[in-house]
Amino acid sequence: WKIMMIERLGSAAEESSNGFNNAGTGHAGFMEPNYTKETVKDGKATVTHEKIVTICEQFMLSRQYWANLARKKLIADPDAFIHQSDHIALGIGEDQVEFIKKRFEVMKKLPLFDTIELALDKETQEKWAPLIWEGRDPSDKVAMTRIKYGTDVDFGALAKEKVKAFTKVGGDLRLFTEVKDVKKQADGRWLITTKSNSVKGTQQIKAKF
């Protein structure tokens, strides 16, 4: 197989993956409450955990993959694009505080999340995230959980490194090229019509997939 990558811009990762357009969170389920839904089990209110386990496992596999690419000298040292960062989930108001507490009770029993910490007091919360209490009413109900080995990822830098790796192993990168049409042929292959800034007219490429 030969693989071709077609990029409309002059370099890869300049849109969604660009650092200015991407939050950079390493999504591992550590601090995303929407991955844990409230439910009732054995007559007791709790939260689901299946989705956070799946997401965390997927992210850990991604980290292993990046580390393997780095070991093979195909991408830069991971320190160039991934950094350890606290991941904090925040709940404000009685309902959210109760949800964060339920979430904590479920997560701390799971091996992937057993280092999770819960803070219900203002003093600890100010140490974890000082700005949360700036200008806030001291009577507010606030809950936080923290996992200290979360990550911040520069997905733009990572994507550029992976594109470099792609070309190192023989990948064909076409910059300033836009896909104009994609049609499946009778033989099951695909006819790709492209337009490049450097060539007049359109070009056609046949691909297996």
Residue positions per predicted region:
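Glycine-rich FAD pyrophosphate-binding loop
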Residues: 1-18
